[in-house]
């Protein structure tokens, strides 16, 4: 049986200014992470009005996480959408984080390719928080640690 890697990151940050987040901050964090990752990992987006056109798709970290290629089904004349191989757990974040306060959220990465790129993923989270999150793009200084957990 092949091992299928799943890891959970705990991302703790301290607010450098007051941060106002929506009730569930997952979409906000996903957007900040996506922008940071694209600016680091995609060589084609700056030439294509922000659209990643990296080829082959299988080698592009941004495309693998945010726009996984569809897989052909061998027995049928169809293609299957592939779910993005990461999950953001932001349910523990408050809507208001005051300057100086710390907050924590989690991200889970799934699959071999994402695990080969853990350093890039961590750096993208650092950049996303440094660029700012929330309504006013308030900045936070990031600290992240890898917390692997076994499959059930």
Regions found by a protein language model. Name each.
Residues 1-152:
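RNA-interacting cores
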């Amino acid at each position: 049986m092949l091992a299928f890697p799943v890891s959970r990151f705990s991302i703790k940050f301290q607010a450098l200014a007051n941060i106002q987040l929506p009730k569930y901050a997952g979409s906000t964090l996903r957007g900040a992470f996506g922008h940071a990752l694209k600016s680091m990992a995609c060589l084609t987006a700056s030439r294509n009005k922000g659209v990643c056109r990296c080829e082959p798709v299988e080698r592009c970290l941004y495309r693998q996480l945010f726009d996984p290629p569809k897989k052909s089904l061998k027995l049928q004349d169809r293609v299957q959408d592939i779910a993005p191989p990461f999950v953001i757990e932001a349910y523990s974040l408050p809507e208001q984080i005051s300057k100086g306060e710390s907050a924590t959220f989690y991200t889970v990465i799934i699959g071999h390719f994402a695990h080969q790129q853990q350093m890039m993923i961590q750096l993208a989270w650092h950049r996303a928080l440094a660029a700012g999150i929330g309504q006013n793009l308030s900045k936070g200084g990031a600290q992240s640690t890898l917390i692997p957990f076994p499959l059930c």
